[in-house]
């Protein structure tokens, strides 16, 4: 099938022919195009940095390696958050002096899909105008790679989720102590992805009892990620039994 390209990112099935699926070739051209867009938006800046992360899909590590290397080849530094969540990555962009972010995920698509979500310096989706430019640049393949002395670097930031949880708990609008006193109990279906890490950290800090199902990050979803009734039977049973 043809790659899907819109304001929420580029996505497709893994493997096959370029331009028809999400292949290493398509990943390189997409990240190179995004790098060009970033440089044009910051013409007088040096040492530009982006934050990258991925969900729990099996293809995520492979794609992440290509993404980071391509950014570096375009002279852009990378803060690598590793396995993460999209809200955490967006928060990381805002709080690490970054000019953009890239999340490797296909959201609610089946596990044979993966995708690239592009974010601006505010941790938000690109504007319609920038998406049009991104598509144009990725198709024209008109970008200049950096020479040896100007390659970017990679810094691992595996505590980004922890720092994001700290920031959430410090929000003035969140009545943390009141929540702790409620003795709440919840069930969570993490579908073997990044939520398996992030959600328990937040719930524990809020003194919320929780039961996590499908919490093993193994690159395979236990069911389709789209939250339809037929995909929520395990969660419904967990709520009845544990809450």
Label every PLM stretch briefly.
Residues 11-15, 56, 85, 104, ...:
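Short, flexible micro-motifs
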């Amino acid at each position: 099938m043809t790659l899907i390209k819109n304001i929420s990112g580029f996505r497709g099935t893994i493997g096959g022919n370029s331009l028809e699926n999400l292949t290493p070739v398509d990943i390189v051209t997409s990240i190179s195009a995004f790098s060009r867009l970033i440089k044009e938006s910051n013409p007088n800046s040096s040492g530009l940095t982006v934050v990258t992360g991925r969900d729990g899909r099996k293809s995520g590590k492979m794609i992440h390696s290509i993404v980071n290397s391509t950014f570096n080849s375009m002279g852009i530094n990378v803060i690598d958050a590793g396995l993460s969540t999209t809200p955490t990555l967006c928060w990381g962009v805002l709080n690490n002096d970054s000019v953009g972010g890239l999340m490797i995920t296909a959201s609610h698509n089946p596990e044979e899909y993966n995708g690239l979500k592009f974010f601006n310096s505010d941790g938000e989706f690109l504007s319609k105008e920038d998406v049009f430019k991104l598509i144009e640049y990725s198709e024209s393949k008109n970008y200049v790679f950096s020479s040896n002395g100007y390659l970017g670097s990679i810094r691992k930031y595996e505590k980004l989720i922890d720092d994001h949880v700290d920031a959430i708990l410090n929000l003035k609008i969140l009545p943390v102590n009141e929540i702790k006193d409620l003795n709440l109990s919840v069930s969570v279906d993490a579908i073997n992805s990044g939520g398996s890490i992030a959600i328990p950290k937040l719930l524990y800090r809020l003194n919320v009892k929780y039961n996590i199902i499908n919490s093993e990050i193994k690159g395979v979803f236990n069911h389709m990620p789209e939250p339809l009734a037929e995909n929520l039977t395990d969660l419904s049973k967990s709520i009845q039994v544990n809450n």
